[in-house]
Amino acid sequence: MGVLRLLVLCTLAACCVARSPPAPPLPNAPFAPLRPLGCNDSEVLAVAGFALQNINRVQKDGYMLTLNRVHDARVHRQEDMGSLFYLMLDVLETGCHVLSRKALKDCGPRIFYETVHGQCKAMFHVNKPRRVLYLPAYNCTLRPVSKRKIHSMCPDCPHPVDLSAPSVLEAATESLAKFNSENPSKQYALVKVTKATTQWVVGPSYFVEYLIKESPCTQSQDSCSLQASDSEPVGLCQGSLIKSPGVPPQRFKKTVTVSCEFFESQDQVPGGENPADTQDAKKLPQKNTAPTSSPSITAPRGSIQHLPEQEEPEDSKGKSPEEPFPVQLDLTTNPQGDTLDVSFLYLEPEEKKLVVLPFPGKEQRSPECPGPEKQRTP
């Protein structure tokens, strides 16, 4: 009986081994987490510089941005695809218009009472062996320094004024008229005012910056500066209109100054091509059949948002402070990541895809972040 029972148990064990289904496969391991980097590391500062260079390059309007400090930096190393950096950058507006295409090293930040500052979030792809530098996405938010802060530091300094104010337009048109009268060989028309401040000197004074374009009209036409044409802006002018008491006292004497800087001619429309530094975009094959999870793009996705000055309410004690520079940048919300087709950067038959993760928050930031400021903002 015991032998029979042992025989039955052995038979059952053999059947279970033979017919047991294979063990379920292990779930795929999640993508490697983002690694925090020091905000003053040489690699991080170099990548931040490339990112801002690309952001400036694709703009068609406004002023170039310069780096004040790296606020946060993470990296995702991706085997043969190189690295994808996630950067949060504190930036300052310079006095160089984006159409000037000047080297960023030649563009300093504005004087403190004209300060415009903010933050950019950027993703930047680096593949050193393949000599690829690429900006897939960015977003920036900028604000001017508040009038209250300017007044507390320098009560008599110029302060910003509405660009559409009649006195601002008067300063722009009269200073441009002066420039045209002193340069009769070619006439220029006003495109738009880009900056304006006011100050009381010996009377009301206005200081303006504005874009100009070539005008088909002649010097004898008084409305030349307001005539429309399809030509692109060719330069940036700085003008001033200072009014001082005249004779009789009810009238003002006007003093007008102007200087204009002309842009170098561009062979291509700014921002119209692929900003990858090491690639000729006109020769790059572009795919348009990629699935939604891996869109094929050449120009970076992003924008620069200008917000009004932020005033601190008098009864703000005990309240949570408002986020000064709200910036969102998410190519995906999938915590496991999605893929981004960057095959056009590599010119190879097989597809090349980057893994893109949600933009990181403040958690697990490097203790070396934020980095040191280059210029203290008011």
Curated annotation (Swiss-Prot):
Liver. PROSITE patterns: CYSTATIN_FETUIN_B, FETUIN_1, FETUIN_2. Its main location: secreted. Transmembrane segments: none annotated. GO terms for cellular component: extracellular region; extracellular space. SUPFAM superfamilies: Cystatin/monellin. Disulfide bonds join C96-C107, C120-C140, C154-C157, C217-C224, C237-C260. Protease inhibitor required for egg fertilization. Required to prevent premature zona pellucida hardening before fertilization, probably by inhibiting the protease activity of ASTL, a protease that mediates the cleavage of ZP2 and triggers zona pellucida hardening. This is Fetuin-B.
